[in-house]
């Protein structure tokens, strides 16, 4: 059974992204776990983390709900946020509360559409919560329609058809908040 109470726990609060990629100076599961501790001490209500190693280390240090992702690049696709079942399977094993996936209308590796992959994902993990990382209004509506549990504005400005968007795109956040019934997580370009 899905734990929808998680959305009440994070509503109105700050979810802090604790991520550093391999070539970035803070790349280390140890450092990410300490960033998560600092976020929790500062009042964060949740953490967004990348990789099984970081999620596992963060889980040892904080008790905040987590949005988990795995950034994985495939040569035949621009989609890299939890793009395939391989990454979803690995994240489910961590016990992360919410798994975020790129929900843009771009094709995934192997030419799969979002509908193709998410149908497989939802059938395999009916009780797992999934967040749709969207770049535009139409994607958010579609993500809700196919069964995502929440939508985020994560990809606004990062797709060819949204590049140049001034971030944070508050009008986009407001528009989808009024249009969907699932929770909306305002994310991307928010530096306050």
Predicted regions: what is each one?
Residues 1-26:
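N-terminal amphipathic alpha-helix/helix-capping segment at the start of soluble metabolic enzymes
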Residues 11-16, 62-76, 117, 122-132, ...:
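Short beta-strand/loop segments at the ligand-binding rim of alpha/beta enzyme cores
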Residues 15, 46-48, 67, 99-102, ...:
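Conserved beta-strand positions in the central sheet of alpha/beta enzyme cores
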Residues 18-21, 41, 70-74, 94-108, ...:
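Glycine-rich phosphate-binding active-site loops on the catalytic face of alpha/beta enzymes
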Residues 25-29, 48-67, 78-85, 103-121, ...:
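Active-site-adjacent beta->alpha loops and helix N-cap segments on the catalytic face
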Residues 35-48, 94-95:
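Catalytic domains of carbohydrate-active enzymes, especially glycoside hydrolases
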Residues 39, 58, 91, 143, ...:
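Conserved, mostly hydrophobic/aromatic
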Residues 43, 62-66, 94-98, 124-127, ...:
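Glycine-enriched alpha-helix->loop->beta-strand junction motifs that scaffold or abut catalytic
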